[in-house]
């Protein structure tokens, strides 16, 4: 729900601040609106992205396992930093491939065991599996099955499996493998991937998605490749993630905004050294993919005989960078997003759910993006109102660019006064 809030600012002694964007609402014709500046061609993206995935399918034995990272629904981060990107673009892109696509939803047994909750929705991962199934099927997408990963006899995972099976949903299990992911000799063997269930699929494109990170999407893809090759099918693997965008500069504000969004995960964008060595081209990836690539490469070699990819960048299919039509608009939108993330991290710190390290990291990203807090128009407006009244104040920027403020009084808090104004 926080993504639906208007842009507002509440300065206090600890600078406890919220800065959120609203969902765009229908606007009156002819209204002046700075948000109408478009930096991203969404129609071009839908066409180019779906074509590129089809092309990747054709390079293998008409069978591609696509690890789908990030949010499929309501990707407001992408829509904020790439003005013109629709929050449901990735879902719409998949719908263009609906006749070829089959979805497998992955969930980790340890996450079921500890009732892991999605921070943005406030529901447990197992409940989100059912929500995702409903969302996909209501849009005409085929969900073939659910896969429980890292299984080691958890009772809660057994109960969840039975619950799904009673609903008529196919459920497969991937077991916890000792030494994963480094012990490739064991992993790529009958005692490793060989012990896992083989997920029966019927379509050329198998989209592997999950309620959240760390669910085992890549492990599921590689386990399936092992089983497919055992059956004589030369299936392939690819990775779909919007950020970081591989073919724009490392320190481009769009990529810096991704680092700000993942400050709590300690993700760091970096030049892909494997791609640079193989092709002499500079591309951007993030640390976790770069660090795991030698292991993934070794697994591919054991499964296929050779690795089809020379770098983590090669594995990706993201076309977003090719659809930026106004770079300056995207840069400015991304600077605004980094400022928003800074105040969100400050709020998390004050409420005890964040860390100083997150705040420090985003402060550094602000400097790298050549942005200041005052670049967000509501900030100086609220600070000025606070200075005038000597009490916390709030400011909101309307869609037409006007700034509204609210002050603290005996009757109302600053936010309440702001909304009334």
For every predicted segment, state its role.
Residues 30-209, 224-376, 381-383, 398-400:
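Flexible phosphate-sensing "switch/lid" loops adjacent to ATP/NTP-binding sites
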Residues 407-408:
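Short clusters of small/polar residues that mark proteolytic maturation junctions
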Residues 3-6, 10-16, 23:
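Charged/polar low-complexity intrinsically disordered segments
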Residues 388-392:
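Short, small/polar residue-rich loop motifs at catalytic or cofactor-binding pockets
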Residues 411-421:
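A short, polar/charged loop-to-alpha-helix boundary motif
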Residues 215-216:
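Conserved glycine(s) of the Walker
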Residues 220:
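Hydrophobic positions on the alpha1 helix immediately C-terminal to the Walker A/P-loop
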């Amino acid at each position: 729900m926080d993504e639906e809030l208007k842009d507002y600012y509440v300065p206090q002694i600890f600078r406890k601040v919220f800065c959120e964007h609203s969902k765009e609402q229908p606007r009156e014709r002819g209204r002046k609106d700075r948000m109408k500046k478009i930096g991203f061609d969404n129609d071009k993206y839908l066409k180019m992205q779906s074509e590129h995935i089809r092309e990747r399918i054709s390079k293998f034995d008409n069978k591609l396992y696509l690890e789908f990272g990030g949010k499929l629904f309501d990707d407001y981060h992408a829509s904020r930093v790439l003005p013109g990107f629709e929050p449901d673009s990735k879902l719409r892109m998949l719908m263009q491939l609906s006749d070829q696509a089959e979805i497998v939803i992955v969930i980790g047994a340890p996450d079921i065991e500890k009732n892991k909750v999605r921070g943005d929705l406030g529901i447990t991962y197992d409940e989100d599996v059912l929500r995702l199934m409903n969302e996909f099927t209501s849009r005409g997408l085929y969900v073939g099955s659910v896969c429980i990963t890292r299984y080691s006899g958890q009772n809660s995972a057994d109960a969840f499996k039975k619950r799904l099976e009673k609903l008529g949903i196919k459920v497969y299990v991937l077991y916890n493998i000792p030494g994963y992911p480094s012990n490739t000799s064991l992993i790529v063997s009958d005692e490793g991937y060989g012990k896992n269930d083989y997920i029966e699929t019927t379509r050329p494109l198998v989209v592997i998605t999950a309620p959240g990170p760390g669910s085992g999407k890549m492990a599921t893809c590689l386990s399936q490749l092992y089983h497919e090759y055992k059956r004589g099918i030369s299936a392939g693997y690819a990775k779909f993630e919007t950020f970081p965008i591989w073919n724009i500069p490392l320190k481009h504000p769009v990529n810096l905004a991704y680092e700000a969004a993942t400050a709590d995960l300690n993700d760091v964008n970096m030049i892909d050294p494997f791609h640079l060595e193989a092709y002499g081209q500079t591309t951007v990836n993030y640390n976790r993919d770069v660090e795991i690539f030698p292991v993934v490469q070794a697994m591919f070699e054991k499964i296929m005989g050779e690795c089809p990819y020379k770098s983590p960048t090669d594995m990706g299919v993201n076309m977003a960078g090719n659809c930026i039509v106004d770079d300056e608009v995207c840069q400015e939108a991304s600077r605004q997003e980094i400022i928003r993330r800074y105040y969100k991290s400050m709020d998390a710190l004050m409420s005890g759910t964040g860390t100083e390290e997150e705040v420090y990291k985003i402060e550094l990203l602000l400097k790298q993006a050549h942005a200041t807090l005052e670049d967000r128009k509501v900030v100086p407006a609220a600070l000025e109102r606070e200075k005038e009244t000597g009490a916390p104040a709030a400011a909101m920027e309307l869609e037409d660019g006007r700034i509204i403020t609210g002050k603290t009084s005996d009757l109302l808090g600053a936010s309440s006064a702001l909304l009334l104004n």
